[in-house]
Every structure is written in structure tokens, then in C-alpha cells.
Amino acid sequence: MQAFAFASAVSLALAAAPAESAPLRVASLNLCTDELALLLASPGQIASVSHLSHKPADAAWWRSARALPANDGSLLSVVPLRPDLVLTMGGGGGDKAGIARRLGLRVLDLPYPQHLDDIEQGLRAVSAALGRPQAGGALIARIAALRRGQPKRMVDTVWLGGGGRSVASTGLTADWMALAGLRQRPLRGDRIGLEELLTRPPSLLLRSDYRAGQFSTEQNWLRHPLARGARSRVLATDGRRWTCMGPSLIAEITRLRRLIS
């Protein structure tokens, strides 16, 4: 059922224009489709990426992205570039497809992934649309290898962001963590307080460094003496890669698995 829903969403998106040969000018409107395009497209195939990918604070791939023109995330912003394929995610459904038809654009609108299977299906869809199925297959094979080699011993872990924010114990983030041998602890409201951090410290704190240098109340929480005194092993992780939870996490999960084993 999940695979059918994913395929249906992709099919509706591609209905904006007839299928053609491999596109030569691809525009991506979304940070998460930027990631897929940069990983899967051939040199010179990308015409534009979203403005967020130009920002080092938001995108781990900003260096590659800055070699390309940025757009503001709207269909209208890429019309002057005359793309033959537009990539986006979770945006507008039928309305966006209708606008695309009026503008003469072919749009691939992916649903937001909920599980690892969705990541693999997204890779298949985008690599096929780009005319580069082998590139998608290579990344899918790497995810499959991680899944086959998932550690049997799981470490009690809390993924920790600013202000005590954490993540759900089920779903895509937890799925990726499990591939590294980390079991996300269930938390009320997906947050951990200083009291629990001190009285029931997890074996491991997976601390996101997303905007770690930014002055804010949430970041100050992580610097609180009580937070710093928690009796847990702490590993830092590149929080930017967890925003989309896409295939750029493959290398991060491999790194974490090596550190934990």
C-alpha cells in the first residue's frame, strides 16, 4: 500500500507533461530534491537549485550548489531558465501540476519520505527521470548493504537538538539511526528535559550540530552546566544531513557505526 501511494504521487506529478528523453536542463525547487539532483545528475545537467542549498548553515552540499544558479523555490522563478524537468517535494499536488501545464513545464513532485523504503523509491524515481538509473541503483545498493549489516546490539540513544528537541522513536529518523546501531529512546513530546538527562541519562547522546554557532535560547540550553554534565557518551552529527534524511546520510551512518562498534 505504501509503495502504491508513493508511485501514485510520482505518477500524478509527471502527468504535468509527456515523458521525454533524458532532460538537459533540470531545476530543483526544494532543499531535499537539491540533494537528490546533486547526487544523481550528470555534470551540466542541473540548471538551478533552491536558494537554501547555497547556505552553509542549511546544506551540507553548499559548495557544489554554489556553482549553480539559485531559485526562490517557486515555479515562476525557474521559467526564464527554460528547464525540461523541475524537481520538487511535497508541494501543491494537483495545483502545482496545473500551473506546470500552463507554463509548459514537466514537474516531478515527490512525496515526503516516511521510511527508508520511500528513500529508495525516491532515488528510483529521480534517477529514472534524469535518465540515470544506474546512479540511483548505486545509492540504493549502499542503503541495502547498510540494512543487511545492521548491528544486532542496539545502543540506548537520544538524538539531541537545541532546547532538548529530539525525534520520534519510530519513523525515518529512527530507521536511519538503527542502521548505525542506535535505538532512539521514546520521549514524551519528542523532547528530553534536563532532569531526565541527569537522572536517566541515555548511553549515548547523538548531538546535532545544526546551527551550533548561532546565539539562541535553544542553543544555550545545550551549553547549560547540567546538560554538559550528563553522564552519557556524546557524539556530534551533522544536523544539516538530518533535515531531509536523504541519501547523504549514508556516509554519516557509516561513520557513526564505525565510532560505536
Predicted regions mapped to residue ranges:
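Extracytoplasmic substrate-binding proteins
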Residues: 22-25, 85, 95-165, 186-188, ...
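Short, solvent-exposed loop/turn elements at domain surfaces
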Residues: 34-39, 54-59, 160, 165-169, ...
